[in-house]
Amino acid sequence: MAQRQPLNHELSKLFNKLWDADVNRFLPGKDYSISLQGKADFVPRGSNVSRDSASEPLFCSVNEGRLKNTETYSTFSSLLDNYETSTGVAELVTPQEMAENNHFLDAVLGTEVMKLTHQYLVKKNWAKPDLKDFKSQLYVIWFHLYSRERGKGPDSCGFEHVFVGETKRGHEILGLHNWVQFYLQEKLKHIDYKGYVARKNKSRPDEDDQVLSLQFSWKGHVKPVGSIFIGVSPEFEFALYTIIFLQSNEKVTRQRVRIEEYELEIVVYRHGLYIGTAYPILLSSNNEDLF
């Protein structure tokens, strides 16, 4: 069994600072409520058959006014329909979509979370001090298109994989680690929540937990285990994954951190100069996320 890596105290301190600075975070019981319902069964990867342990959606309510009127959420939401979700199908980025990407980056760069992130990265010499340079760097890391399948045209980017989700060869869900996309897709009845994945030594997560492992189907495909932050702002996730991506040139970077009461492993896969995937794992969970 792989030895658990030591806690990264420097990143834990920084990420808690970002958590506290995240004024756009939705709070459980105030800005949203969820219904965990039953514990999901084990489903092998690649299977599209799963017992539904949750007859109702995960999200009972979300403050839609706040979603629409908070700039980082509204600009983020406008990006979610810009992608062809099947890998192997080439993406075409229109001038309007490029403008939407830039509006989103401008919105997140105006937040305290991303200002603190930029300061940290400059101090580490992983980003340039000029904001325009930093924005260009973020654009390349997150929005530059690349190919996930050999011999096919550019069909993916880090943003699409992590925040929107993709399907592979019509039978497997890749990515989709974002609560806003989950909620919006659930509302459209494209996502069917199947139940929570229990953490070891804790038979059931709490409905105010802001990190969950869960099982769901999307457009007919099953995700056996998906790890997801609930309620955090787009800029918070963007910051965490960018920091860990820029730390290392390794194919996979894993950092064990403690954020609030959550002991997590933040995992970032690199696709050359770009983000391949990124997600949190609850370390007390029985199952690692199937990315």
Question: What annotation goes with each model-predicted range?
Answer:
Residues 1-257:
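N-terminal "domain-start" segment
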Residues 234-291:
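Compact beta-sheet-dominated globular domain cores
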